[in-house]
């Protein structure tokens, strides 16, 4: 099954290409990392995936539904999105499990009634991430890393088929980052895990679970495909426009440094 299919997708603003001729396919059972420097077009690409923006040209098919021939709100409910910016929108006194529950309704805060089964589901999602200790704790006392874990559990509450993690380690210290990545790797191995799209510009965050990479550069696809084929010194040197070196990092990860 094709999870995502972009064909000749471009986005123009003020007569300038911000994304140009994007051709990209994601298949079921693939987890992708999207790598790009600031201004490469990563955020625009995500908004085109979720239907928040409309392209200037090209066709987008997501989860078998073609934009323009399907209900955008219905399709958006099948996509989970986690970003650091979302953390600050929630109310500090809400309990962690209440924030997770709000993912059922895509709301900031919990205003709908819920039953015990739904509450148990929220607690189970926290448990899946190894976060049972956060149950009954107020959001405002959580660390930045814990808040990000709660956001991931919230996104999973609606059982999405795609989970977008938009620079989830932003604002985390070294130890919180490593904890988040470890929990994400464990989570990815659970049954019925959605397709994960992980956005970053830090190569050391690229876990082995990411089978494929998309490199965005100046609004264009610089390289896309299986990780082992494109995560090389040769490709990365042209991506960064300067010589680089690859160094082994913890957990079978690799860090890139200037040569």
PLM regions and their residue ranges:
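Helix-to-loop junction immediately C-terminal to a conserved catalytic motif
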Residues: 50
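Conserved ABC transporter NBD signature motif
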Residues: 58-68, 75
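Conserved ABC ATPase "signature" region
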Residues: 116-134
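Conserved ABC ATPase signature
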Residues: 138-142, 146
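Catalytic Walker B motif of ABC-type/P-loop ATPase nucleotide-binding domains
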Residues: 163-167
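ABC ATPase nucleotide-binding domains
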Residues: 239-259
């Amino acid at each position: 099954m094709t999870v995502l299919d972009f064909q000749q997708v471009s986005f123009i603003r003020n007569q300038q290409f911000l994304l140009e001729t994007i051709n990209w396919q994601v298949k079921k059972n693939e987890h992708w990392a999207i790598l790009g420097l600031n201004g490469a077009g990563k955020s625009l690409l995500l908004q085109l995936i979720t239907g928040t923006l409309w392209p200037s040209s090209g066709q987008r098919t997501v989860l078998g539904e073609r934009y323009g021939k399907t209900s955008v709100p219905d399709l958006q409910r099948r996509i989970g999105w986690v970003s650091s910016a979302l953390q600050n929108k929630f109310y500090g006194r809400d309990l962690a499990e209440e924030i997770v529950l709000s993912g059922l309704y895509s709301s900031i805060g919990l205003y709908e009634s819920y039953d015990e089964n739904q509450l148990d589901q929220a607690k189970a999602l926290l448990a899946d991430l190894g976060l049972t200790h956060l149950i009954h704790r107020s959001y405002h006392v959580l660390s930045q890393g814990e808040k990000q874990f709660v956001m991931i559990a919230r996104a999973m509450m609606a059982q999405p088929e795609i989970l977008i993690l938009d620079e989830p380690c932003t604002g985390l210290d070294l130890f919180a980052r490593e904890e988040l990545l470890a929990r994400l790797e464990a989570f990815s191995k659970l049954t019925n895990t959605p397709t994960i799209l992980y956005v970053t510009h830090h190569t050391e965050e690229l876990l082995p679970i990411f089978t494929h990479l998309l490199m965005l550069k100046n609004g264009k696809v610089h390289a896309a495909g299986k990780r082992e084929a494109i995560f090389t010194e040769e490709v990365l040197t042209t991506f960064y426009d300067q010589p680089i070196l690859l160094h082994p990092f913890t957990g079978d990860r690799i860090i890139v440094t200037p040569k």
